[in-house]
Amino acid sequence: MIRMYSTIRAPSSSTPWRQYLGCPQVETRVISGQMSNMATFSALMDWKNRLDRKHTPQRLGYVLNNHIIRGGHLSAQPMGALKDYIAVDPVTERTAVVNFPVCRDDLFRIDVEETKKVIDRYRPELIIFGKSMVLRREPVAEIRRFVTEQNIPTTIMYDMAHVLGLVGDHFQKPFEEGAEIVTGSTHKTFFGPQRGVIGVNYRREDLKWGLWETIQS
């Protein structure tokens, strides 16, 4: 970890990050966790519109995230970094965001079974795990298993800004559990300088390789 700290300052020093996060691709030019999220949301919207560049770009459809009152990140909210990329539901005339249901006896623990029902109903294009107030692990593996079994096309992202220094056996290994994208800041539980990072679990042969190329651009 000391060696990683000494090399993380340079934008080209992505190898230690790939080893630490356990993913094949990392972007380190972003300067904060919020910028990491903005770059990811922008890339997702651009990738969604990749086959039609003649018309007004469509924004992201439904997004599933943690409610800010339950510890969710501000940058993952419609009033945060997500605001320029999220669609408006034409029926409700509200932003197309739904929140993870929580357990009645633990308001900071996601109710997995109820979440499955929400996903089945709204078919979110993006699922954002992660909180600024973390008391429990996020059920990444359980939700990945469900969307795979139900063949629901979505992208699973984990904003680890506040827990990036806890990646590993004692907390969570997001990519092993099924996350596709991990964002974070390097100056909270991870003891680095003021920077951001984006890691993805995409390879050249994957359908979403183009999404990674868009994130890089």
Task: For the regions a language model picked out, list residue spans one by one.
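Conserved PLP-enzyme active-site core in the AAT-like
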Residues: Y5-V26, I31-S217
